[in-house]
Each structure stands twice: as structure tokens, then as C-alpha cells.
Design a protein with these regions (language model features):
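OB-fold and OB-like single-stranded nucleic-acid-recognition modules
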Residues: 1-183
Length: 183
């Protein structure tokens, strides 16, 4: 039998202000939180990158701030949906080589796609001051007892996206979160 708290969680990440990561209530399941009467596992946040540290080729620690607060983020690029296995990359490369040998009319498109895939493969390059959208899970750093985000998607955005994001959050909070009858 499935735990009712798991079956009732949001299917999509809950879009939140950073301050609400710390306001969310824990549940019996350490991976599930509840806020505004809504149980959830994943969150989506947006803000300005204020610190980047402990960076390797595939992992990094970040600090993201919005108008409401700051949160620490751990990001492992191999855990995202954009990762491609070495076997898949080898197969793509071999197919590309074959297509170029035989004069495939779509070779320029394939070349562009290969470049884009290669540039995205397990690459961690973030700069302080850039705007970012982050999707991940809340977890508690056991050494400090502080809530953090374990991110599986980090995308650099823009100031224009930040404005749209803040408007969208205002709408969600006014229409769905704050006035949620299950609160």
C-alpha cells in the first residue's frame, strides 16, 4: 500500500520564494514538505547567484538569493535530465561520422546539435551575479542542521525572466497558495 503523503504530493515542482523553503513544514517522510496545505517534494526557485564554491567538473555549491532570502544549493550535473551517457555520446558520434561520409543533407543541423550537446554535457560553469532558475529537493545538511536544495536542474536566465518570475509567483501566491482552502 502506498503512503498517502506520497500519493498526494505535487507532480510538478512547487514554485516558491526562497524564504518559504525555510517556512515549509516537515512531514513524517523526510523528503516531503507541506506549505499552504500543499504537500510537495520538489521546488522551483529563481534568483541571483551570489556565491559559487567547491566547484569540480561535474558538481558545485551555489548560493542563490531572491528578494526574500538566500539558500545554499548543491548541484551535481550528472543528476539532471540533460546528461548523456558515454555510450549514447559514442553512438551519436558514430552516426554523425557516417552521415558526414555519405553526404547527409542535414549534416549542418546535425553538426550544430552535436556542438550543443557536447557543450552541455556534465558542464558546471556558473558566474556570480547571473540569474538562475533552480529545480530540486529540499534536504537538511546534517552537519549544520540547515535546509538546502539538492538541485537536479540549474539554468542561467536573465533579468527579464526574473521580472516575469516574480509576477508569476505573486499570482500563484494570491490565487492558489494563500487562499488555499486546505490550509
Amino acid at each position: 500500500m502506498q503512503d498517502s503523503s506520497i500519493s498526494n504530493i505535487q507532480k510538478n515542482p512547487l514554485k516558491l520564494y526562497i524564504q518559504d523553503i525555510f517556512r515549509a513544514n516537515s512531514t513524517d517522510n523526510k523528503y516531503i514538505y507541506k506549505l499552504f496545505g500543499l504537500p510537495f517534494k520538489n521546488v522551483m526557485i529563481h534568483g541571483v547567484l551570489t556565491a559559487v564554491y567547491n566547484t569540480t567538473k561535474i558538481t558545485t555549491n551555489l548560493e542563490l538569493s531572491d528578494a526574500t532570502g538566500t539558500v545554499q544549493i548543491y548541484y551535481d550535473s550528472t543528476k539532471n535530465n540533460n546528461s548523456i551517457s558515454s555510450t549514447s555520446w559514442r553512438d551519436l558520434t558514430n552516426n554523425y561520422i557516417d552521415a558526414s561520409k555519405f553526404g547527409d543533407p542535414n549534416i549542418l543541423i546535425m553538426s550544430e546539435m552535436m556542438d550543443r550537446i557536447k557543450n552541455k554535457m556534465n558542464c558546471v560553469v556558473f558566474e556570480e551575479g547571473c540569474f538562475m532558475s533552480v529545480v530540486g529537493d529540499i534536504f537538511v545538511d546534517s552537519s549544520r542542521g540547515v535546509r538546502m536544495i539538492s538541485a537536479y536542474e540549474c539554468n542561467v536566465t536573465s533579468a527579464a525572466y526574473d521580472v516575469v518570475w516574480m509576477e508569476e509567483l505573486r499570482y500563484l501566491y494570491d490565487k492558489f497558495y494563500i487562499n488555499n482552502p486546505s490550509c
